[in-house]
Amino acid sequence: MVNEQKRFALFLATSDSTFVKKAYGGYFNVFVSTFGEDGEQWDLFRVIDGEFPDDKDLDKYDGFVISGSLNDAFGDDDWIVKLCSLCQKLDDMKKKVLGICFGHQILSRIKGGKVGRASRGLDMGLRSITMVTDAVKPGGYFGSQIPKSLAIIKCHQDEVLELPESATLLAYSDKYNVEMCSYGNHLLGIQGHPEYNKEILFEIIDRVVNLKLMEQDFADKAKATMENAEPDRKQWQTLCKNFLKGRSEQV
């Protein structure tokens, strides 16, 4: 019996920058190269531009990924409200949904959590987050051994301020109480960016500085976090793939 091709969808909640288009061909390629594997089908829906799958097609997918965004997850833009409605349907269907940054906050919003401006302000750079090892089940998407901490690239000004009762806190940091959380076995939110690398982060920082939206001193400090350290990208990649594809390889 031949296994059916797995099918996933990316809900892109941001526009491709000129740099990302030139260097990677767009954010879709960044996500697929991070979370995708040979033999899979990945579809792109630019939700920020109003592109959404038909309800009748949702069951054809094995999982979904919601990207980061410059927009507020607590906003009432038409496309954000529609995305929330879609995610509620996926939750009811118990479909796997991985939320990254803005996507993480969207998942909390639809489950009844509180999302807003980060209480300790904008965060950019490499950060270490601590796992709540008691909350993580061995043999799940972390594998048999749970790491005490993992480094990840951060780039956000909003956060999950209060988790809903249905959430399980999986990770926190010295600056934010909610760095990663799950809802049942089918929704997973990560505040950081497993898909980012140093090149992508630095270009975003430079662009924000040029727009006069960030002080140079703050930008320099953000870049300095990656002078002698790197994100645990392979571990995050394994974790996210395990979650989306129902595996338990060691992170």
From Swiss-Prot:
EC number: 3.4.19.-
Alphabetical list of Gene3D superfamilies matching this protein: 3.40.50.880
Glutamine amidotransferase type-1 domain ranges (all copies): 17-214
Swiss-Prot/TrEMBL keywords: Cytoplasm, Hydrolase, Protease
One MF annotation (Gene Ontology) recorded for this entry: peptidase activity
Residues of the signal peptide: none
Residues forming the catalytic site: 101, 193, 195
Pathway involvement of the protein, from the record: Secondary metabolite biosynthesis
Superkingdom, taxonomy of origin: Eukaryota
Primary role: Involved in glucosinolate biosynthesis. Hydrolyzes the gamma-glutamyl peptide bond of several glutathione (GSH) conjugates to produce Cys-Gly conjugates related to glucosinolates. The gamma-Glu-Cys-Gly-GSH conjugates are the sulfur-donating molecule in glucosinolate biosynthesis.
Homology family: Belongs to the peptidase C26 family.
Name of this protein: Gamma-glutamyl peptidase 5
Gene: GGP5
